[in-house]
From Swiss-Prot:
Task performed by this protein: Probable transcription factor.
The protein, known as: Protein indeterminate-domain 12
Molecular function (Gene Ontology), one example: zinc ion binding
Organism (species): Arabidopsis thaliana (Mouse-ear cress)
Xref: SUPFAM superfamilies: beta-beta-alpha zinc fingers
Stretch list, region Disordered: 47-66
Region (SHR-binding) residue spans: 196-208
Annotated GO CC locations: nucleus
Annotated residues for binding of Zn(2+) 2: C188, C190, H203, C207
Amino acid sequence: MFSSHSLSYKLSSLSTEASASSGNNTLSTIQEFSGFHNVISSVCTHTETHKPKKKRGLPGNPDPDAEVIALSPKTLLATNRFVCEICNKGFQRDQNLQLHRRGHNLPWKLKQKNTKEQQKKKVYVCPETNCAHHHPSRALGDLTGIKKHFCRKHGEKKWKCEKCSKFYAVQSDWKAHTKICGTRDYRCDCGTLFSRKDTFITHRAFCDALAEESARLHSTSSSNLTNPNPNFQGHHFMFNKSSSLLFTSSPLFIEPSLSTAALSTPPTAALSATALLQKATSLSSTTFGGGGQTRSIGHHRHLTNVNEFLGVDRVMMTSASSSEYDQLVVDGFTSTWQKADRLTRDFLGLTGHGGHVSVRPGDMLEYAGGVAFPMSAYDTESHDHSFQKAYDHLGFSGAHRM
């Protein structure tokens, strides 16, 4: 019994909450709709206040009963149809001549029109057959108007403004322009002047777009310069001029038969001058030293780039006869004295591959003074005694081969 009462109480409370929530939702919906209605009404009011301007009707809508007159270009542009006998000034219409005669105190008379002639109007068509005003339905009702139209659209522009170099076909247009030229100019940031605001706005939009595009291209190019491709950063080895001068006195050589694996060691970040000298001499020892290596030193030796010896994985070289160096083998960067102790490093590359010290005199003189002697001069038996003394004096022992 108690449970049924509690259940009914819960159901009633839930229905009350649901009705309250639905009422709140309805109220919020009404408020949102009223706000949306206000927005729509404000937008409609704004559009009503800014209605587009009504376009001007096309010129030339004559009376159907008007008289259509077609004049030739020569007659239309004639300025001396009616000439004053006093000053020889020409006029296109007789009435203008009669009015001009009053200034000379001459008798003048205007042509009187009756009532019927006044009621009938005259319209003029353009002599140009391709023009829209050539059709009678688009004829112009004024002789001066058709004359200016023909000059502006189909005539020669012979009136020039001295300030802005603009040309005009009608003198009245030229005079009106000269009065305001330079007083109402619109200047763009690029330096161009405009006398009309609409042309200035059109040009300004195009000029701004062009400036943004050029700025974007400039920023892209500058970012590429400041952040180069990281793949090429590890292949460039930098060293100072003092260390590079250490290798200019004695040239280094490398042959085409060298294995690229021997030169594929990763470059170090920075080396001192002593380390560079040791590395260069070790490379020289592998190139020139050793009794079992086949070498040939001629007059057509070519220098290789020291920078590429020190870490660049591309070796540029040329040789007078590459077949002479086919048997060259690179064993390493350093060689040891081939004695029993093997504790002393040979940085000058004076040892060979055997157990004895094997030095060629030409190598010693090359390292000492940078003077290259032809090997053929030391291959004969006549020079054995002269260089044997030099070896004994230096303290080298063992069998050597001349």
